[in-house]
Curated annotation (Swiss-Prot):
The lineage of its organism: Bacteria, Bacillati, Bacillota, Bacilli, Bacillales. It comes from Listeria monocytogenes serotype 4b (strain F2365). NCBIfam families: cyt_tran_rel (TIGR00125), panC (TIGR00018). GO terms for biological process: pantothenate biosynthetic process. This is Pantothenate synthetase. It catalyses: (R)-pantoate + beta-alanine + ATP = (R)-pantothenate + AMP + diphosphate + H(+). The gene is panC. Catalyzes the condensation of pantoate with beta-alanine in an ATP-dependent reaction via a pantoyl-adenylate intermediate.
Amino acid sequence: MLIIRNKQDLKEAILEQKKANKTIGYVPTMGFLHEGHMTLVSHARKETDFVVMSVFVNPTQFGPNEDFDAYPRDEAHDAKLAEEGGVDILFVPTVEEIYPTELATKLHVIKRVSVLDGADREGHFDGVVTVLTKLFHLVNPDNAYFGQKDAQQVAVVSGLVEDYFFPINLRIIATVREADGLAKSSRNVYLTEKERKEAPVIHEALQLGRELIESGETNEAKIVQVMTDKINEQPSHENIAYLALYSYPEFTPVTDWTKGIIIAAAVKYSKARLIDNELINVKRR
């Protein structure tokens, strides 16, 4: 596995593979890798000839009161997992490499971001599409791999790829979970022992919501209340940041219960904010 830190070396390495007619699979990450990331790598390994992973904690998607400096980083751990997983190139740029000068232009997301994380984190998704535009141009992948856990991000990135004609096939992979149902996340390390024991209730609540919808329930307030009551059975969380239903991928109010629906949750614990979701009537790509 090659570890590359600058744009020019990456471009040259990618061009060499393109000249050999190799297909490129790309897994963008912010590091502190876990099994969820490696599942994306596994899919890329099976479906493409050459796998590139980036590890870059992107400052432009963090708000002024968010945890950019505290975000967990462990390059040695990431490199070990990436190599064991079959990554061919690990791209680990500095902030200066990706943002060498102040931006002269700005990408602004106007749809799919007025609710959930988009509402709570102003400018977050602008930062996401900005860095992915840069990285997509550098890696020039055939396939790019994302996890369903970040479903709103997936919807936003799908819009980016469609709007700007990126010749990239987005592959959306099911959320990887612990044995007790908790979605794998780099932020799980911040949970106390009691919080970690109780956090799987988020997934349990979402499953309840799914069951209600699939049984024909269309009273949104009732569905949300049942899920809220379930989460509140385990009192270690500080608050429920959101628990809501929307059409997917539009993130507008549900008007047709036979089409794509997302049930999404964000729950705040003492040092971690965990997100999870269930997609209904949605085929993964």
